[in-house]
Design a protein with these regions (language model features):
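Extracellular-loop-to-transmembrane junctions of the mid-late helices
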Residues: 2-14, 114-153, 193-205
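Hydrophobic alpha-helical transmembrane segments of multi-pass membrane proteins
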Residues: 8-28, 38-63, 75-83, 108-118, ...
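Membrane-water interface of transmembrane alpha-helices
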Residues: 18-25, 81, 143-159
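Membrane-interface helix-boundary motifs at transmembrane edges
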Residues: 27-42, 65-67, 90-103, 126-129, ...
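The cytoplasmic-loop to transmembrane-helix boundary for the fourth helix
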Residues: 90-120, 131-140, 165-183
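Interfacial "cap-and-anchor" motif at the non-cytosolic start of specific transmembrane alpha-helices
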Residues: 169, 175-237
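Membrane-proximal linker segments that couple transmembrane helices to downstream signaling/catalytic modules
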Residues: 218-265
């Protein structure tokens, strides 16, 4: 067995274990939070998608046949998988109008990667798509950077909001937020370069796996530390933001209503 096969097999087992841990931890949650549970299943789906990708790589010998083919398959699966994990985090951090915006942008970037791959295949007439691979890499990097920036912004806003609204200890939440952002930054810095070279993938792959395991354990810890008070804060915050969003769409909300009342008077 060569090193590449062992790495891919280890990644396959690792992703399945992480997915099972997330599913089994559902049994130990004291208080259910709908947004957290939604995020849990999104991340579980992402881990199973990654596991399927490693299984396909092993069965088909895709990475072994060429770094470019391995990179193409990686980007076709990594992009939606990473988007699901990022949205799982973002779903906990922000409110409905902003979540919708992230879904649209992530979908557009994923579609751009798949279209680029299809155009490259038609243009070259083979699976070796040449310089179109770097166009795919550009869209992949843009997707990762976008997810990191959006999550970072929402974490800062939510931290300030919770400090104003909550008198209880929010250290578990802050710990989860920091770890999630660090892991996303790690993926943003490492993966676009690692997937182009099998040697780099073998060196950096175990580091990314350890980071993902830490993320999984921290995410599970967040779920077990949820209390009803935090759920109420989430609902109240979402209600306030949704109300402001509706007022903005109605043309200024309270200020327009004040102007109308003075006009009528």
């Amino acid at each position: 067995m060569n090193t590449l096969y062992l790495l891919q097999f280890g990644c396959l087992i690792f992703m399945v274990i992480n997915a099972v841990l997330l599913v089994m931890s559902r049994l130990y949650v004291k208080w259910e939070n709908k947004r957290y549970e939604h995020s849990r299943w999104l991340i579980v789906i992402a881990f199973f998608m990654l596991a399927f990708q490693y299984l396909a790589q092993i069965q088909g010998g895709i990475r072994a046949s060429g770094d470019d083919l391995g990179a193409i398959v990686n980007m076709l699966i990594y992009t939606p998988s990473f988007a699901l994990i990022a949205y799982g985090i973002y779903n906990i951090e922000t409110t409905q109008p902003r979540r919708r915006h992230m879904v649209i942008v992530s979908t557009v970037l994923c579609t751009a990667i798949y279209l680029t791959c299809a155009i490259g295949y038609l243009h070259s007439g083979s699976q070796h798509i040449g310089w179109w691979l770097y166009v795919m890499l550009l869209f992949y990097a843009a997707s990762v950077v976008y997810d990191v920036v959006m999550i970072s912004r929402e974490m800062k806003k939510r931290k300030k909001m919770l400090e104003r609204m909550a008198a209880n200890d929010i250290q578990p939440y802050l710990r989860y937020s920091r770890v999630s952002l660090i892991l996303l930054c790690l993926a943003a810095l490492v993966m676009p370069f690692a997937i182009l070279s099998t040697t780099l993938l073998i060196i950096l792959g175990p580091m990314v796996l350890c980071a993902l395991l830490f993320f999984t354990l921290t995410f599970i810890s967040l779920g077990t530390n949820y209390v009803p008070t935090e759920s109420l804060l989430d609902d109240e915050a979402e209600r306030i933001v949704a109300q402001r969003y509706a007022e903005t769409r109605n043309g200024g909300g309270i200020f327009c209503n004040l102007f109308r009342s003075r006009t009528v008077g």
